[in-house]
Amino acid sequence: MQRLLLLVSLFLVSTLGAAASPIAGQWRFVPERSTDLSPWRVYDLTITVEGDVVTLQRQLAAGRRVHEDTVRIDVSQAVNVVPSAYWPDNRHLGAYMGGDKTMKIRAEWLDQRRLLRLSTDLVLATQQGPRDLNILSDYKVSANGAQLTLTMLRSTRNRPVVYVFRRLTTEEAAKPAAKGKSE
């Protein structure tokens, strides 16, 4: 009986711990504190955490152009292979998803789940031919939980890309995402 009670307690603690991950929530891009988002103007990010699975849902917009994608990552897996037909991060560069059109993502939690670190490998198709790309991404929530900073270092760049987000209030999250204009 004590063993069963212990197992149930451990299950509840692990479930509540995952649900209470400080990084989970709805986030809105803050352009004045971030690297230029070109070619997009709006970036809303929703992060959900269910056990070992983290879901990153992006909504990007500029004018009438809108792009949405969802990436599910199982942090307990050594590598997550995620299909991706489109690379929206810098479409004005003339670089598109190439190779097998997948991202190989390795993930780990740091700092009591306040920081999610991803290492993503993919192949881009460019005018010069296929180009292997590695992106190191840190999603870090502030100590007070109000700000999320996404720092990305690409193997093709010397300087990191830094995006700052603010946590949406319950009222803001209930409204439809902004389309095409930053706030």
Question: Where are the language model's segments positioned?
Answer:
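Bacterial N-terminal signal peptides
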Residues: 6-15
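Positively charged n-region of N-terminal signal peptides that target proteins for export
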Residues: 1-4
